């Protein structure tokens, strides 16, 4: 597809929503013979995660400024200039043919440094509302890509979906097994858990189990295991519940589930679509610009999900939605198919193709 020896600098960090899609593209290009290098920050998750995938990573010193104190904001311009110079040094040493920015603090200085060096800059925005870094960089980027329609209003952007792991794409293509009598509910609140799910699910399951057999696989987050387990026991529901601080094998969890209760992060929404699972979405209420609500609307408008704002969520509403899905397995299956229908399954290849094209143009 492309001559071996091409080089790409990938900039993504801070959260899994940035890092994992970037890793999907990096792995794909590495398989094509590309040399991949990463730019990130030393105190965020990319510092630990990226080397595990065999990629070299360089660090620059940059932190976010949005919502911080006055002194930090006054110092920010000087820190930004320093971080741009740090990124410039990395670029001068590595000499990438193209730079890919997928969000996180390092993307801003790295993107500016790339354009100052005359290197093509590709941006990819995972959320339905762009983050501040990508919003600013979109004005100077060579090509802007996004996962959802109407993400950018001031620049022309190509909609390509969110890159996700090939294992999940393959899972979505598998025939769905016959539904068990028990409704299987997967609860995922992120690596830290979601307090609202941990607080409400034990009682909601108790209410639901009066009418319906139900089993639960609940990711409760770090340090929450004992408290949530006790809550399920208090409501007499510990028998059909699998509780874990963190679910390492999401492929197995998605394969097991009939329905997913979760937040509406961009990567989560894209994964639900790819694996073809119906969902109850509770957007994180403190997300910047309420972007999770916009993310979730993609599945809601397709008829593949229910969206419940956390401000109005209570035990009875949650139990009621689960009961509704349990009572109509045919509609549950249709919701799963609608989710799969809106999935963009070649997002990784599309992002890679843009990078390849720009690198070949020089």
Swiss-Prot record:
It is an enzyme of class 2 (transferase). Keywords: Cell cycle, Cell division, Cell inner membrane, Cell membrane, Cell shape, Cell wall biogenesis/degradation, Glycosyltransferase, Membrane, Peptidoglycan synthesis, Transferase. It is a peripheral membrane protein. HAMAP family: MurG. It comes from Shewanella baltica (strain OS223). PANTHER family: GLYCOSYLTRANSFERASE, UDP-N-ACETYLGLUCOSAMINE--N-ACETYLMURAMYL-(PENTAPEPTIDE) PYROPHOSPHORYL-UNDECAPRENOL N-ACETYLGLUCOSAMINE TRANSFERASE 1. This is UDP-N-acetylglucosamine--N-acetylmuramyl-(pentapeptide) pyrophosphoryl-undecaprenol N-acetylglucosamine transferase. The gene is murG. GO terms for biological process: carbohydrate metabolic process; cell division; cell wall organization; lipid glycosylation; peptidoglycan biosynthetic process; regulation of cell shape. Belongs to the glycosyltransferase 28 family. MurG subfamily. Disulfide bonds: none annotated. Its EC number is 2.4.1.227. GO terms for molecular function: UDP-N-acetyl-D-glucosamine:N-acetylmuramoyl-L-alanyl-D-glutamyl-meso-2,6-diaminopimelyl-D-alanyl-D-alanine-diphosphoundecaprenol 4-beta-N-acetylglucosaminlytransferase activity; undecaprenyldiphospho-muramoylpentapeptide beta-N-acetylglucosaminyltransferase activity.
